Amino acid sequence: MVLDTDVVIAGLRSPTGASAELLRMARRGELTLLISVPLFIEYDAKCLEKEHLDAAGLTTQDVQVFLDALTVIAEPVSIHFTWRPQLTDPADEMVLETAINGQAKALVTFNQRHFGKAPAAFGIELLLPSEALRRLR
């Protein structure tokens, strides 16, 4: 499963939400998260933005610990093939490429409109965090 950056941020900002529960399930080994270097770099940059730190009530160190843990529990994906352009937003291409190259069954995002039908063309389900959580329970 690949989590779009918006889902990771939601998990930090709302500890009782579906996004946070997906992250906890990954920590417990109940699901496998896939991550590539470009996607992790985006997680790092976005999660450390002041607006997200303030909203989550977290420090930079708190988020660094979280991100370090994420690198331990996530399965690394090497990007052997790029499939660009598939999406209307070029910034989302790395998320889709991680899912394709990692042979993910699902890509979880709040921005489903940005991904359109592209994931389905590669046999990848496009899910909201709440949908992913329901399917895993």
Where on the chain are the PLM-derived regions?
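Short, flexible helix/strand-to-coil boundary loops that buttress conserved ligand/catalytic motifs
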Residues: 12-13, 47, 119, 137
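Short, hydrophobic alpha-helical packing/hinge segments within bilobed ligand-binding/sensory domains
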Residues: 22, 95-96
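Alpha-helix capping/helix-boundary segments
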Residues: 7-8, 39, 113-114
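Short, flexible loop segments at the rims of nucleotide/cofactor-binding pockets, characterized by
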Residues: 10-11, 82-88
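Short, well-structured N-terminal submotif of metal-dependent ribonuclease cores
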Residues: 1-35
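Acidic, PIN/NYN-like endoribonuclease modules and their adjacent C-terminal/linker elements
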Residues: 86, 93, 100-106, 112-137
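PIN-domain endoribonuclease scaffold, especially VapC-family toxins
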Residues: 25-82
